[in-house]
């Protein structure tokens, strides 16, 4: 079995929230395939479930574990909402095809009480496979 455990997904909800809270960070565009977020001068298409299934079938991948790029550089009051809406969007993808997609949760590490609550929610209610923890949060 081939498992891709480092697969970033970019839910449209995540792009829209970034634009709302941090308009200097992302530019949103529409193209023939849908929403594209331009982040650090890199165009990133919003998640397309059917296109992703075609991609992993072509690559011979059996399961992908989805996560979002770490948003820990923005550890302000919006982090809990960004994590929750991103986790909810990724969970919706996993529900569409639970044998092919699993998820790692993002947690608002700037608020440990909320991080623990979101971890419990994603593991217990959304049935995520784990959580994302990077080497630093907010430069620490």
Where are these regions (language model features)?
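Helix-coil boundary/capping segments in enzymes
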Residues: 1-140
């Amino acid at each position: 079995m081939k498992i891709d455990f480092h697969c970033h997904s970019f839910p449209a909800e995540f792009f829209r929230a970034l634009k709302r809270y941090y308009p200097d960070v992302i530019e949103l565009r529409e193209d023939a395939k849908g929403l594209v977020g331009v982040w650090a001068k890199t165009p990133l298409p919003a998640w397309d479930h059917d296109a992703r299934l075609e991609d992993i079938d072509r690559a011979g991948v059996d399961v992908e574990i989805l996560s979002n790029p770490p948003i820990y550089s923005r550890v302000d009051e919006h982090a809990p909402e960004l994590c929750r809406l991103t986790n909810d969007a990724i969970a919706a993808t996993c529900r569409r095809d639970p044998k092919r997609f699993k998820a790692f949760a993002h947690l608002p590490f700037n608020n440990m009480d909320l991080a623990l609550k979101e971890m419990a929610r994603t593991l217990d209610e959304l049935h995520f496979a784990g959580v994302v923890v990077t080497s630093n949060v907010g430069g620490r």
